[in-house]
Design a protein with these regions (language model features):
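Active-site metal-binding motif and surrounding structural segment of the metallo-beta-lactamase
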Residues: 1-26, 115-121
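Alpha-helix capping/helix-boundary segments
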Residues: 6, 30-31, 51
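Metal-dependent catalytic neighborhoods of phosphoester/phosphodiester hydrolases
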Residues: 10-20, 39, 163-173, 198-199
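Core dinuclear metal-dependent hydrolase active-site scaffold
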Residues: 12, 47-115, 191-237
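Cap/insert and terminal regions of metallo-dependent hydrolase folds
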Residues: 23-32, 94, 102-191
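Helix-loop-beta element that forms the nucleotide-linked donor phosphate-binding surface
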Residues: 34-48
Length: 237
């Protein structure tokens, strides 16, 4: 769990996972939320940046790394807990997960200390030009991917929660158009679909049919163009 915002730390999801007895690895301070949600303290490991934890069995290790974001679930706990990116490593493979973040030069340091990566998972949705310090968006995600040294690119944090004013599929369409120019291998399965990155086929824009709602003979397209102001309100997550 990268940080404590509601779209990353969901009560119902945590409660369901807690019943399975799986271990939780998270950022400093977030463990208190997990305990309050019913996770036994013995199953929670909190990490500061650059700390790592090897899960039971010894085959999977998680390292917390820097990200550029913030935390808080209410009006009085702003930045009371840490936010992180995560590197998940086995003997054969290494995966980078950005959590929520703006574009940061720390990615170069992460590459030096923890890379290279077979798969890079970067947040691309819920973005706005005035939020660049805390959210990547598709263009900055491509820059972050380069700083991290490449690897297959699995875009995350898009198409689910409506947290910004752009069309829900804009991140996907932007990446589909611009990633080939940079020689980036995109991995874009349907939401929730298992995928093996090495065997991933050419991206098909499945979201184009998912974005239309049919009401009788009328097609109502959700991804309408919106008039986005130059400055948008500060996001809550």
């Amino acid at each position: 769990v990268s940080h404590d915002h509601y779209d990353h730390l969901d009560y119902g999801t945590v409660r369901a996972l807690a019943k399975t007895g799986v271990p939780f690895v998270t950022s400093l301070g977030v463990g208190a939320h997990l305990e309050a949600f019913g996770v036994p303290a013995g199953l929670i490991t909190e990490l500061d940046w650059w700390e790592h934890h090897t899960l039971p069995g010894g085959e999977l290790a998680v390292t917390a790394a820097p990200s550029q974001h913030f935390s808080g679930r209410g009006l009085k706990d702003r930045n009371a807990t840490l936010w992180s990116s995560m590197v998940i490593r086995t003997a054969k493979h290494s995966v980078f997960f950005s959590g929520d973040t703006g574009l940061t030069t720390e990615y170069g340091l992460i590459r030096e200390r923890l890379g290279p990566f077979d798969l890079v998972m970067l947040e691309v949705g819920a973005f706005h030009p005035s939020w660049g310090d805390i959210h990547l968006g598709p263009d900055n995600a491509l820059e972050a991917h380069a700083l991290l040294g490449g690897g297959a690119f699995l875009p995350v944090h898009w198409g689910t929660f409506s947290l910004a004013m752009h069309a829900w599929d804009e991140p996907a369409e932007t990446l589909l158009a611009r990633a080939p120019e940079r020689g980036v291998q995109l991995v874009m399965p349907r939401l929730g679909e298992p995928v093996e990155p090495v065997q991933a086929e050419r991206v098909t824009p499945w979201w184009r049919s998912a974005g239309s709602l049919h009401a009788g003979d009328t097609v109502v397209t959700e991804a309408e163009a919106l008039s986005v102001p130059k400055v948008a309100g500060w996001p809550l997550d």
